[in-house]
Curated annotation (Swiss-Prot):
UniProt xrefs under NCBIfam families: rpmD_bact
Keywords: Ribonucleoprotein, Ribosomal protein
Taxonomic classification: Bacteria, Pseudomonadati, Pseudomonadota, Alphaproteobacteria, Rickettsiales
Subunit organization: Part of the 50S ribosomal subunit.
Species: Rickettsia prowazekii (strain Madrid E)
GO CC entries: cytosolic large ribosomal subunit
Pfam families: Ribosomal_L30
Keyword Zinc recorded: no
Gene3D superfamilies the UniProt entry points to: Ribosomal protein L30, ferredoxin-like fold domain (3.30.1390.20)
Gene Ontology terms, MF aspect: structural constituent of ribosome
Signal peptide region: none
Keyword Secreted: no
Protein name as it appears in the record: Large ribosomal subunit protein uL30
Length: 63
């Protein structure tokens, strides 16, 4: 079995101005607070759920 968890690279491409508070806090939880900032996170269910909530602000790449 392959127990390797793939990583995803998430880049914020749009501003959080005008978004709901829960979406802003989701971005902060992902480690994003500025446009064009990127983070590499493990591809887990909780991270995918957070990304799904703010996918209109992000660019997602598999690694």
């Amino acid at each position: 079995m392959n127990n390797k968890i793939n990583n995803i690279k998430i880049t914020q491409i749009k501003s959080a101005i005008g978004c709901k508070y829960d979406q802003r806090f989701t971005l902060i939880g992902l480690g994003l607070n500025k446009i064009n900032k990127s983070v590499i996170l493990k591809n887990t269910n909780s991270i995918r759920g957070m990304v799904e909530k703010v996918k209109h602000l992000l660019k997602i790449e598999n690694m």
